């Protein structure tokens, strides 16, 4: 979440003219941006900060999880982790049987053995063609580990290997 105060506008190089074009969004809403009739943006509530986006444009669907993830941690008590799971499942269930061409979702090694729970739940619900893991803290080996641990599950989504910051991908969706 970024507040559009003078300090942050200056920090991020946002002019007053540009700020007038920014629309602040809320969870669980549908947005139809001005001057277009072929893009629809739906938001989901994050389990941390902000929202996740489901964007439909010209027959294609892109999902960006943001911080919507199954944030289960070793240092938290069972009640916290169970509550987090319930909140996450409530949101991610909105993607049941949704065809998603391109998805971006957290795969966070800080969660230790639970690092892949969020993507597992996402993949069990949505029909995803390509999935880009994110939030992996410059530890791209976690992507290969995730894929190897799930070799027997015959995932229908192609999990994209990311090897370095700034890497360029060409994907035909």
Would you name each region that the model predicts?
Residues 1-4, 9, 41, 122, ...:
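Generic low-polarity alpha-helical segments
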Residues 11-12, 44-47, 67-68, 104-109, ...:
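Noncatalytic linker/hinge segments flanking ATPase motor cores
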Residues 13, 17-33, 115-173:
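Binuclear metal-ion centers of metallo-dependent hydrolases, dominated by the metallo-beta-lactamase
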Residues 1-12, 93-104:
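Active-site metal-binding motif and surrounding structural segment of the metallo-beta-lactamase
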Residues 21-99, 166-173:
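Core dinuclear metal-dependent hydrolase active-site scaffold
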Residues 2-7, 29-31, 49-51, 70-74, ...:
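Active-site environment of divalent metal-dependent phosphoester hydrolases
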Residues 1-2, 63-67, 83, 102-109, ...:
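Active-site neighborhood of phospho(di)ester-bond hydrolases with catalytic His/Asp-centered motifs
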Residues 87-93, 112-121:
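A short, acidic, amphipathic alpha-helical segment used as a generic capping/interface helix at domain edges
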């Amino acid at each position: 979440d970024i507040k559009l105060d003078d300090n942050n506008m200056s920090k991020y190089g946002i002019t007053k003219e540009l700020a007038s074009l920014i629309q602040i969004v809320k969870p669980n809403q549908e947005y139809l941006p001005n001057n277009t009739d072929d893009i629809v943006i739906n938001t989901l509530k994050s389990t941390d900060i902000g929202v996740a986006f489901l964007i439909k444009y010209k027959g294609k669907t892109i999902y960006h999880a943001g911080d919507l993830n199954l944030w289960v941690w070793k240092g938290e008590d069972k009640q916290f982790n169970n509550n987090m799971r319930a909140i996450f499942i409530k949101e991610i269930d909105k993607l049941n049987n949704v065809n998603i061409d391109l998805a971006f979702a957290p795969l966070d090694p800080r969660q230790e053995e639970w690092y892949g729970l969020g993507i597992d739940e996402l993949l069990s619900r949505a029909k995803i063609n390509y999935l880009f893991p994110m939030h992996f803290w410059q530890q791209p080996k976690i992507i290969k580990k995730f894929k190897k641990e799930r070799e027997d599950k015959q995932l229908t989504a192609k999990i994209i290997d990311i090897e370095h910051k700034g890497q360029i991908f060409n994907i035909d969706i």
